Amino acid sequence: MEEPLTVAAIFRDPFNILAISEVLKVVAAVGWSVNYIGMVHRAWKDQIPSIGILPLCCDIGWEFVYAWMFPDFSSHWQGVVRVWFFLHSAVLLVTLKVSPNDWVHTPLGHRHIVFIYIFVTLVFGAGQYALAAEIGPALGFHWGGALCQFLSSSCGIAQLLSRGHTRGASYLIWFARAISTFAGFIKLCIRFQHNVDGAPWLDSPMCWFYIVTVLSFDAAYPFLYSSMRKLETPALRKESRIKNQ
């Protein structure tokens, strides 16, 4: 019988492959938390949302379902999903505060921002619950989280392209997301090989498509961000010269 993966067990045998997977889980947990805190800071500093409406509402819906409705199926994260729920709630509050600056060109949306965010969050929450009812909470936890990660990475790219500037974004937000995603994928591969946490979903071609796509988005992001920064610099200098004249 395998020894439970406690902190003491990890220190006794730090090179055990499952112990390494636990360390990767901690890296992912801390990384995502830093990502959310970074979004709060950047959104407040730049007075513009740091995350799109779809990934934010999907994340909150997923976290609510598995933190409060099916907590047993996120128990291997030892309460981290609840921490993420509260951190994302802070992201939502700041986003609602600064969203009018980003929705100024959409009068209808500008007038109903709070309703839109609440409605989309409820829809994603209902969808996550329906997915859990359809395929079971164990697989639903993984596949629902996969959708969250896909939206987070893809919408980060889309946000840069649609805005044409880097306000609301930062290397810290990207790095925390990328390292957490990569660590999480390696952890899942290890646990799949050892049949831990019920992860049969990794033998799915769709799962590998999702993994490759998300990693590709995260790998491309810093290059796009850097290109945007280079385009912004001359424009900012020109604006500064005009103000000083």
Swiss-Prot record:
The keyword Repeat does not apply. Its EC number is 4.2.3.-. It comes from the Eukaryota. GO terms for biological process: terpenoid biosynthetic process. Keywords: Lyase, Membrane, Transmembrane, Transmembrane helix. InterPro entries: PaxB-like. Its main location: membrane. The chain crosses the membrane at residues 17-37, 51-71, 76-96, 113-133, 138-158, 170-190, 205-225. It is an enzyme of class 4 (lyase). GO terms for molecular function: lyase activity. Pathway: Secondary metabolite biosynthesis; terpenoid biosynthesis. GO terms for cellular component: membrane. It is a multi-pass membrane protein. It is found in: Membrane. Terpene cyclase; part of the gene cluster that mediates the biosynthesis of paraherquonin, a meroterpenoid with a unique, highly congested hexacyclic molecular architecture. The first step of the pathway is the synthesis of 3,5-dimethylorsellinic acid (DMOA) by the polyketide synthase prhL. Belongs to the paxB family. This is Terpene cyclase prhH.
